């Protein structure tokens, strides 16, 4: 019985040696913010590392419509840009229009004399970048020919008509004299002249319209010359016509002279388009145009430009994210995430940052947990938190500044004759996209590595700052925790947090308590051994007492034991 009492007292003494439960000591642990479910990001050294927070850098969807702000967006409806420029009757509404972006619809069609443009893409690009269909008529003198030719394939209302910006010249009577007309450019801007040549469907039509069996058109300036002859022959019927018109264009610089020489088949200019330099463009899209604001437009619709990358469409207009092949790239905007462990030690110990993060700390990234005579508590360290946030906040903006294009990426078209150029251009574009995709992944991985390193460094700075303050008044318990060997109430804990702790005030008390506690302190491993040994001895003594009682009862005859074989 005495032995049992001694063991019970010993067990109580072991429990009483928990230094964190006394009034003369305190425990302070440093920790960092954690979340239950973090986000996986890629760094230089790890393919997947979990962080508390991350921002998606790739815009993968459009808003489904084209915003008419911040740019002047002109809906071409049933007209292509070239038809509007030539003056197709059903496109007269676009005369003298201006735009930042001209939208061509898949439903657009031509409704005049059938034509082709040998260098269609270049002309379309020149007119689109000019951003206007401003046209000025000039007084060309065409002597000895009939002007204003018309066709039943080109109706303006119910009457036969023709392209409003072109003048179809045919014979006058039985003659078609050689034409030689000049027009100087006395302006201080470039002039764009549109002209053409008619290809009759037969020799009979050729002589009927132009007398000569074969015509010729030569258009020249001081810098260039083009000579075109008609290709007479039947072609597939389009709007009742098997003939064709080929459209050409000439740019006349200030001080230069336009010269037109022809003996037949000439479709003459009526004036010029004023060329302007700018960043206007044209885009094919069937997305609806609506009232909204966006600085980036794609054929799929407008997209936000608050991300540095996008994989919506390679064709863009405006201030747009860089196109890459990846569907997702995440930029770490938080620290390394170590989800909090819920299991506590035998004495309810509080854990520090080495073991795990703290999910309950919502007002900061770094902080303190403490246990003292007044209980337990937690508080964030705002200074170290702000230091980390300041370094991370500018990352997204810096990445956007490095990658957002301040120009438009126009559509590129090539005729079948230029197939090899088209293949080369496609190869170059694909190579650029591959390079940017690789660079984007590398850039994000580098930034993520830097973010994780700097947040870890801030945690270590806070730990070292606390250790230097406490000095010999506390012992580093490992795992980011300190055992403080003096009475440290909440005000004392607050002074450690804000950096005003004076270790000299508590030095004598801490030194005295350290020696007293060290003299009787048993480490947690020995406490566990004592508990197990005392439990085993108690069980053994109970068994001995029970066996002795049985033997005593048998001797007195109070218990009979019969053994049958």
From Swiss-Prot:
Residues 17-529 are extracellular. Residues 551-565 are cytoplasmic. The chain crosses the membrane at residues 530-550. Keywords: Clathrin- and caveolin-independent endocytosis of virus by host, Clathrin-mediated endocytosis of virus by host, Disulfide bond, Fusion of virus membrane with host endosomal membrane, Fusion of virus membrane with host membrane, Glycoprotein, Hemagglutinin, Host cell membrane, Host membrane, Host-virus interaction, Lipoprotein, Membrane, Palmitate, Signal, Transmembrane, Transmembrane helix, Viral attachment to host cell, Viral envelope protein, Viral penetration into host cytoplasm, Virion, Virus endocytosis by host, Virus entry into host cell. One of its GO terms (molecular function) is host cell surface receptor binding. Residues 1-16 form the signal peptide. The keyword Glycoprotein applies. GO terms for biological process: clathrin-dependent endocytosis of virus by host cell; fusion of virus membrane with host endosome membrane; fusion of virus membrane with host plasma membrane; viral budding from plasma membrane; virion attachment to host cell. Major glycoprotein, comprises over 80% of the envelope proteins present in virus particle. This is Hemagglutinin.
């Amino acid at each position: 019985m005495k032995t049992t009492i001694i063991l019970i007292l010993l067990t109580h003494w072991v429990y009483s040696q928990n230094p964190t439960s006394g009034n003369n000591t305190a425990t302070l642990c440093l920790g960092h913010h954690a979340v239950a479910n973090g986000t996986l990001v890629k760094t230089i050294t790890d393919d997947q590392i979990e962080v508390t927070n991350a921002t998606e850098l790739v815009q993968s969807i459009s808003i489904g419509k084209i915003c008419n702000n911040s740019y002047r967006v002109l809906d071409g409806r049933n007209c292509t840009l070239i038809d509007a420029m030539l003056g197709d009757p059903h496109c007269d509404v676009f005369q003298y229009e201006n735009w930042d972006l001209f939208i061509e619809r898949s439903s657009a069609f031509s409704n005049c004399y059938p034509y082709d443009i040998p260098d269609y893409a270049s002309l379309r690009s020149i007119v689109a970048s000019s951003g206007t269909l401003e046209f000025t008529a000039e007084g060309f003198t065409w002597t000895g020919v009939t002007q204003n030719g018309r066709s039943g394939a080109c109706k303006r209302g119910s009457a036969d008509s023709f392209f409003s910006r072109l003048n179809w010249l045919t014979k006058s009577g039985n003659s078609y004299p050689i034409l030689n007309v000049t027009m100087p450019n006395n302006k201080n801007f470039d002039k764009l002249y549109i002209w053409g040549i008619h290809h009759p469907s037969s020799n009979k039509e050729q002589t009927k319209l132009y007398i000569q069996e074969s015509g010729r058109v030569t258009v020249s300036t001081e810098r260039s010359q083009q000579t075109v002859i008609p290709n007479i022959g039947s072609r597939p019927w389009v709007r009742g016509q098997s003939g064709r018109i080929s459209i050409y264009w000439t740019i006349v610089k200030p001080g230069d002279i336009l010269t037109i020489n022809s003996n037949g088949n000439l479709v003459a200019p009526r004036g010029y388009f004023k060329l302007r330099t700018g960043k206007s463009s044209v885009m094919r899209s069937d997305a609806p145009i609506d009232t909204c604001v966006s600085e980036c437009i794609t054929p799929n619709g407008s997209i936000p430009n608050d991300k540095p990358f996008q994989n919506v469409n390679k064709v863009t207009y405006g201030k747009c994210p860089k196109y890459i092949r990846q569907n997702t790239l995440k930029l770490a905007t938080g620290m390394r995430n170590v989800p909090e462990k819920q299991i506590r030690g035998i004495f309810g110990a509080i854990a520090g940052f080495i073991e795990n993060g703290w999910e309950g700390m919502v007002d900061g990234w770094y902080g303190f947990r403490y246990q003292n005579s007044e209980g337990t508590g937690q508080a964030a360290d705002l200074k170290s938190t702000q230091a980390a946030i300041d370094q991370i906040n500018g990352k997204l903006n810096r990445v956007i500044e490095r990658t957002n294009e301040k120009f438009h990426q126009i559509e590129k078209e090539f005729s079948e004759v230029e197939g090899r150029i088209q293949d080369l251009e496609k190869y170059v574009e694909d190579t650029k996209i591959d390079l940017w995709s690789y660079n984007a992944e590398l850039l994000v991985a580098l930034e993520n590595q830097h973010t994780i390193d700097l947040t870890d460094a801030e945690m270590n700075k806070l730990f070292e700052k606390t250790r230097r303050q406490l000095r010999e008044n506390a012992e580093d318990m490992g795992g980011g925790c300190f055992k403080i060997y003096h009475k440290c109430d909440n005000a004392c804990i607050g002074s450690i947090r804000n950096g005003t702790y004076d270790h000299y005030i508590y030095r004598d008390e801490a030194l005295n308590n350290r020696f007293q506690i060290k003299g009787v302190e048993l480490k947690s491993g020995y406490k566990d051994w004592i508990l197990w040994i005392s439990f085993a001895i108690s069980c053994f003594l109970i068994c001995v007492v029970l066996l002795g009682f049985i033997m005593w009862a048998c001797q007195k005859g109070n218990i009979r034991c019969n053994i049958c074989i």
